[in-house]
Amino acid sequence: YAHTAFVVIAGLLSLQGCSKPAAAAPATAETALGAEHISAASAVDAGRYLVKIGGCNDCHTPGFAMTNGASPAEGEWLTGDSVGFSGPWGVSYPANLRLSFQNMDEAQFIELSRAGQGRPPMPWPSLKAMSDKDLKAIYAYIKSLGAKGEMAPAALSPGVAPDRPHIPFI
């Protein structure tokens, strides 16, 4: 009898693994925009990491994408670029983030990141999905670099031909 009971219990336990798993709790705005964040020794370190993995340098640092990240040195990061991106929106140029945010406080930076109203190819959905803590870290990192470089060229309206190199999207 003990052997039969053991077999029945073992069988029931093995069937437990075949049952449908419980549904995961749905994500909430708090989870999507508040709880997830990068941890590092400091906000500046977290911001540096997010800038690196987020691809910010690919557009906002001259020569970075062309050298597969080998150059320029970190002291030259995020100074914008005069190589534009063209498409139905016209031509947009990657902003010099080090100058753009010098007169912007942290709250304004977060508001801008959440609004996401700039031209393509800026990945606004990625910024909107970041937690406030991560956006604050990016802001701290950019501010830590200090002002450097020149402002990016002004965006061009659709139909206006650029007088400098650009990457056509369409």
Describe the role of every protein-language-model region.
Residues 58:
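Short, cysteine/histidine-rich loop/knuckle motifs that typically chelate Zn2+
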Residues 84-107:
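Mid-chain, structured segments of secreted extracytoplasmic proteins
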Residues 1-5:
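Bacterial N-terminal signal peptides that target proteins for export
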Residues 98-102, 111-113, 124-127, 144:
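A structural feature that tracks compact, well-ordered secondary-structure segments
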Residues 14-17:
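C-terminal motif of bacterial Sec signal peptides marking the signal peptidase cleavage site
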Residues 48-54:
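Local sequence-structure signature of Cys/Sec-based thiol-disulfide redox active-site neighborhoods
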Residues 22-40, 53, 61-92, 120-170:
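Flexible coil segments in periplasmic/lumen-exposed cytochrome c-class electron-transfer proteins
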Residues 106-114, 132, 136-139:
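An amphipathic alpha-helix signature
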